[in-house]
Amino acid sequence: MTTTLSSFNLSVGQKIRQKRLEQKLTQSQLADKCKITFQQIQKYEKGANGCSAFRIKQIADHLKVNVIYFFDYLPIVKEENQND
């Protein structure tokens, strides 16, 4: 399975939105906690912008989830040793 940057950003954004809504936070409230604009949260949630590792960690902390929550859909690919 190949993951494109846009599908990755969209998946992470959907997870942010899902957890934010579960916690009954508005985009503005989450943005205030992260010290960014609500427009930036909106862009993350729509997959229009990607998040840096720092921003993902920051959002995860405020949403009270482990950063792994945002990546659990990704398949684990095992590299095979070519000398086997």
Model region roles, listed by residue range:
Residues 1-11:
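A detector for short, charged/polar N-terminal pre-domain segments
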Residues 14-29, 58:
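Short basic helix-loop element that most often maps to the first helix and adjoining turn
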Residues 24-43:
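Short alpha-helical DNA-recognition segment
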Residues 46:
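Short, conserved catalytic or interaction motifs in soluble domains
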Residues 54-69:
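DNA major-groove recognition helix of helix-turn-helix/homeodomain DNA-binding modules
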Residues 71-84:
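Short, charged recognition helix plus adjacent turn
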